[in-house]
Amino acid sequence: MSRRHRAEKREINPDPKFGDLVVTKFMNAIMLHGKKSVAESIVYGAFDAVQSKLKQEPVAVFHSALDNIAPHVEVRSRRVGGATYQVPVDVRPERRQALAIRWLIAAARKRNETTMVDRLCGELMDAANNRGSAVKKREDTHKMADANRAFSHYRW
C-alpha cells in the first residue's frame, strides 16, 4: 500500500431509474468483469420483484435493508507487547455503507434460489425484516466487539 497520498474519491453518477447514488454503488459492487448492463438488469429485476411482493417502494426497502445490515462497531487487531488483541472500534459511515453492500451481495450469492435476481430479492426482503445471513453477520460482528470490550482502552 502506497504511503504517498490518499487516493482521491471517484465521482459516480446516480442511477438512471431511481436517481440514487447508493443504488449505483450497489450496482458497481454486483458487477462482474465490467458487465454493467448485466448488473443493472439484476438490480432492477430484484427491485421489481421486491415491489411486486411487498407492495412497497423498492429503494426504501433497499435502504432499510442496508441500515439493518450496517455494523456500528467492529474489531481490529492491535499488537501490544507480543500479544494481539481484538480491539472494538466504531465504524466510519462510508465503511458502514461499504460493508453493508458487500455483506448483502455475499449473502445473496450464497442463497439457494436459481437466479441472482431471486437471491437478491429474497435477501433484500429478509434484511429489511431483520432476518437473513447478512443481518446475522452484523450481529456476529457486534457480539465479537461486545466480547472484547475489555480491550477498548487500546484504541488508536
Swiss-Prot record:
GO molecular function: rRNA binding; structural constituent of ribosome; tRNA binding
One Gene Ontology biological process: translation
SUPFAM superfamilies: Ribosomal protein S7
Keywords: Ribonucleoprotein, Ribosomal protein, RNA-binding, rRNA-binding, tRNA-binding
Domain of life: Bacteria
PROSITE patterns linked: RIBOSOMAL_S7
InterPro entries documented for this protein: Ribosomal_uS7, Ribosomal_uS7_bac/org-type, Ribosomal_uS7_CS, Ribosomal_uS7_dom, Ribosomal_uS7_dom_sf
UniProt KW RNA-binding keyword: yes
Pfam families: Ribosomal_S7 (PF00177)
GO cellular component: small ribosomal subunit
Gene3D superfamilies membership: Ribosomal protein S7 domain
Family under the similarity heading: Belongs to the universal ribosomal protein uS7 family.
Oligomer and partners: Part of the 30S ribosomal subunit. Contacts proteins S9 and S11.
Alphabetized PANTHER family for the sequence: RIBOSOMAL PROTEIN S7
Function as written in the Swiss-Prot or TrEMBL entry: One of the primary rRNA binding proteins, it binds directly to 16S rRNA where it nucleates assembly of the head domain of the 30S subunit. Is located at the subunit interface close to the decoding center, probably blocks exit of the E-site tRNA.
Protein name: Small ribosomal subunit protein uS7
Protein encoded by which gene: rpsG
